[in-house]
Amino acid sequence: MKGFSSRHIGINKEQKNYMLDSLGLDSIEHLISETIPNNIRLKKDLNLEGAFGENEFLTHIEKLSKKNKNYKSFIGLGYNQSVTPSVIKRNILENPSWYTAYTPYQAEIAQGRMEALLNYQTIICDLTGMELSNASLLDESTSAAEAMTMLYSSRSREQKKGNVSKFFVSNDALKQTISLIETRAEPLGIEVVVGKLDEFDFSNDFYGCFMQYPGIHGSINDLNKYGEKAKSNGLKIVVAADIFALCLLKEPSNFGADVVVGTSQRFGIPLGYGGPHAAFFATKEEYKRSIPGRIIGLSKDVDDNPALRMALQTREQHIKRDRATSNICTSQVLLAVMASMYGVFHGPDGIKRIALKIHELTVLLDNSLRKIGIKQFNKNYFDTLLIEGPTEKIKLVAEENKINFNYIDNKHFSISINEATSLNDIQLIVDVIAKGAEKDSVITSQGTSESKIPKDYVRESKFLQTKIFNIHHSETSLMRYIKNLERKDLSLTHSMISLGSCTMKLNAASEMIPISWSKWNNIHPFVPLNQAQGYQMLIDRLEKQLNEITGFSGTSLQPNSGAQGEYAGLMVIRAYLKSISQEHRNICLIPSSAHGTNPASAVMAGMKVVVIGTDKYGNINEQELKEKAELHRENLAALMVTYPSTHGVFESSIQEITKVIHDNGGQVYMDGANMNAQVGLTNPHIIGADVCHLNLHKTFAIPHGGGGPGVGPICVAKHLVPFLPNNPIINVSSKESVKSISAAPWGSALACVISYGYICMLGAKGLKSSTEYAILNANYIKHRIEKHYDILYQGENGRAAHELIIDCRPFKQNGIEVMDIAKRLIDYGFHAPTVSFPVPGTMMIEPTESENLDEIDRFCDAMISIRLEVDNCSKENKNNLLCNAPHTIKMISSEKWDYPYTRNEAVFPLPFVSENKFWPSVRRVDDAFGDRNLICTCSPIESYIES
């Protein structure tokens, strides 16, 4: 290996030979031939450009970035230029300790980012006036659609009995939000009615309504009047609110809102041509068991110390599966953390000061335009003006001066002011409009200006009064606070994270560096395409790369998570079936081992789930599949299949399985969660799939960010290409296409720069090698630990794919549960593998290609050592190393030590541990206590523990 491959892949030539020798093999090709069925192997290498060196790639991506025109955009429409404080950019966005962590399932080693997320939830609850917020969602439009479906599933018994299924959407909502709401509503049988608020009668044949606050073109709606009408007729209210406007406007809770959604992008998150950004979703506590996404809640550890955890997880899709109200299984953690630190850094006074500046500059612009005879329609507004003028002429002058407005038609346009806007910008805007409208300009000067927020809507309540938002306003203080939280969390900067089905590989610095460049991160998603040629070229190349890798003909980058990719793929199948007059087909076959998002996505796409069992080897039960496919042949829509399977096995009969589906009129959807075992060796097209999603945050090196962002593009066969998702503002597909799946045309486009770099630097050979070494590493771990743990499933030749499942259920006879092993691994400095998925009481281990032999051996040594510790445990005595794990520094430095093992055995169980000891900040967290006493904001926590 040479070039970037040798940096990305952890195993060197000598280590490779040693590992192969341990497995009794003479080559990696020998291993692959025993692992992947020959009938699905690729016959030639991927047709991709040669691999770039790291410096070569950075030169290339910089050159490409210069094709983007970095104009100042006053377009608004849910996206505004923001200012990322340098202390946050350097210490979080560019810090692998933050961006390489995983979703905080292991609470004891995730207290830092969960505190940041608790701060985020507090900001959202304070600004919206609601009781409960989640830890972020994918984008504002997705949040709005989730609100509609949550309230639909929460209708009263009378409404369900009367089939009340209409949902009203104000026509001054964001266009992308209306489109996404319509996408989600149709397969669920929800009738969306779009109209003017002042013409809507709020009749009780509607179960809910949606309002924008302020509206799309800036006017502040009379939520008080409309809220009263809605409540008097039993309608639930969803409000999409601007986060900065809420600093000056009354909270939506004052007007009876049941759900408040929006985006926190304005709190220091770059535009990124559409994302990733953290959306918010706030609601009443009565919906706590229905709210989508993650919630961080306060609990306590076994010593009664305050401890954070993900609350109410039993409501989520991985538990409820096809009964879940949402398929959301990720937050936008990295972006939510950044937004929370923005709130901590600026504090309530600083945030209000920024909001006032935005409003005052908007008023100044309004007054200046009126002076030169330009008509502005909004009487009340926060940051956006609706203006009359010759738009074509004004657009020409604006683009000559490198600024963008939102052009509505040939007589109207709007301008949205943002945090980065200066007095000079206001003068330039006035000059541009004056020239385009053939008027004489005026000199703008900022003096005292009258607020354009109605008196009845001026915010009276304070916000962010908790101590944390009032003490870290210097850079030194915030830097230390960030570092304090960082030290509480285990990430890839500390050790291997072997989470099965999660692919925690290297996120190389050279892939990450460009996302900090303004030429990539400061582009508005709705600029004219000629201003984003760098992005357009990158997107086109990345789509072609993914087509080549999957064997398919078309790709959409729009889905901004794996679960959204699943939904998008199924909606594409649905649209295709409708186009051939087969819309009655609605049965989706799903193996029992599938990830919980699969059945949840199928239900959201209007399909009925029929579960297929697995045999004792972990394969799909082919006989049952045939019987159920034939039973439902008139209505069969799709099979959802993960390949290799979630059991870590390449099923040799996969082509026969997909043929059964096609023979019975269905389409095959392949879940791409395990694509890291396919790239360069086989592909979804060869196995017989029609569509798949990919997890760019797994296989293609986008970091997990502590629980997001994710990107879940879909790749489709030729007959499905016309149905790929579209966008109402920028047309990216055909007339037959599915409507919006995400808010932005290309989803989280900024993150795609990372995957583009990954593919460009590895090239065809490097990608293939990455897959081979991922499989080698998994099989080496299997070889090392199989004498100590039962390996549940393996292929016909005794090989694992890129992951393996160990059975921990026999240890119950020693009083040990799988979670005890997970917590004990913390004492050894490791994050646990995936626990109890896809089989309860097991662990699924996936090492990826990025780890070296020393680290893999340390992990194996830890697992073997723990297995020996299990033998010394008994049901009768829970006072043991595993049941007491993890052990904190506070615990072992205490004078009192009432344990039947030494302090050294507790925290330094093997020699390597002391060289790089990771100390958890809390002991075992009490999950049940946290759910019984739900606390999801950062009010002084000591008072809660006392009570």
Residue ranges with predicted function:
Residues 25-39, 257-262, 689:
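TRNA-binding/sensing appendages of the translation machinery
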Residues 103-113, 119-121, 134:
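N-terminal export/assembly segments and adjacent metallocofactor-ligating motifs
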Residues 112, 142-307, 369, 382, ...:
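Conserved PLP-enzyme active-site core in the AAT-like
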Residues 269-282, 286-287, 331-335, 416, ...:
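Conserved phosphate/anionic-ligand binding catalytic regions in large, soluble enzymes, centered on
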